[in-house]
Amino acid sequence: MDIEKAASRREEEEPIVQRPKLDKGKGKAHVFAPPMNYNRIMDKHKQEKVSAAGWKRGVAIFDFVLRLIAAITAMAAAAKMATTEETLPFFTQFLQFQAEYTDLPTMSSFVIVNSIVGGYLTLSLPFSIVCILRPLAVPPRLFLIICDTAMMGLTMMAASASAAIVYLAHNGNSSSNWLPVCQQFGDFCQGTSGAVVASFIAATLLMFLVILSAFALKRST
């Protein structure tokens, strides 16, 4: 009797645990409903993508305009340098002094580099159009920023070297006994100076293009 009473007391003291009923059906999967704010989150994400595409399209349009201006400027610099020449008669018409860009290797390199840069900028316009049509696309923007950086370095190098030659032509160098020649070849020096200024403008525009592409890529990540 004591054993039966002790067993009954233990049963009364133990907590009652309800076991869950298992579904005996086979192949049934429980479907979890999405949270209540799921649609709201998706709508917010779509709105963010639309807004990002909007301002990136504006950046791409500005990129296209700057790229077109830079192409025209680089080609104008190359054409101006290539067509600048001046001839001075000395005593007779049979003995003349002539100045042209082929007399200086630096000027010849200037024409070649700016021609290459102008051609590249022209060929890169379709990629800029792709960025306008697909503002969220990363590969064309990445391609443009790499090539723009290389072309900016080439343009700056050619413009800086030619600027040094133009400076010597205007002012000379007393230490090296180099006399200024722009007093005699004024038109030639004006033409070369204008070409160098145009090349620096093209390099500056390329720098802005690199900054725009970097800004667009940063906001994409």
UniProtKB/Swiss-Prot annotation:
GO biological process: cell wall modification; cell-cell junction assembly
Disordered: region residues: 1-28
GO cellular component, one term: plasma membrane
Ranges of biased composition (kind: Basic and acidic residues): 1-12
Transmembrane segments: 59-79, 110-130, 149-169, 195-215
Pfam family, one: CASP_dom
Keywords assigned by UniProt, alphabetized: Cell membrane, Cell wall biogenesis/degradation, Glycoprotein, Membrane, Transmembrane, Transmembrane helix
Molecular-function annotations in GO: protein homodimerization activity
Glycosylation sites: 173
Residue ranges annotated as Extracellular topological domain: 80-109, 170-194
Cellular localisation: Cell membrane
Record membrane topology: Multi-pass membrane protein
InterPro entries per record: CASP/CASPL, CASP_dom, CASPL
Cytoplasmic side: 1-58, 131-148, 216-221
Function as written in the Swiss-Prot or TrEMBL entry: Regulates membrane-cell wall junctions and localized cell wall deposition. Required for establishment of the Casparian strip membrane domain (CSD) and the subsequent formation of Casparian strips, a cell wall modification of the root endodermis that determines an apoplastic barrier between the intraorganismal apoplasm and the extraorganismal apoplasm and prevents lateral diffusion.
Family named by the database record: Belongs to the Casparian strip membrane proteins (CASP) family.
Quaternary context: Homodimer and heterodimers.
Protein name: Casparian strip membrane protein 3
Organism, as annotated: Arabidopsis lyrata subsp. lyrata
Lineage, opening ranks: Eukaryota, Viridiplantae, Streptophyta, Embryophyta, Tracheophyta
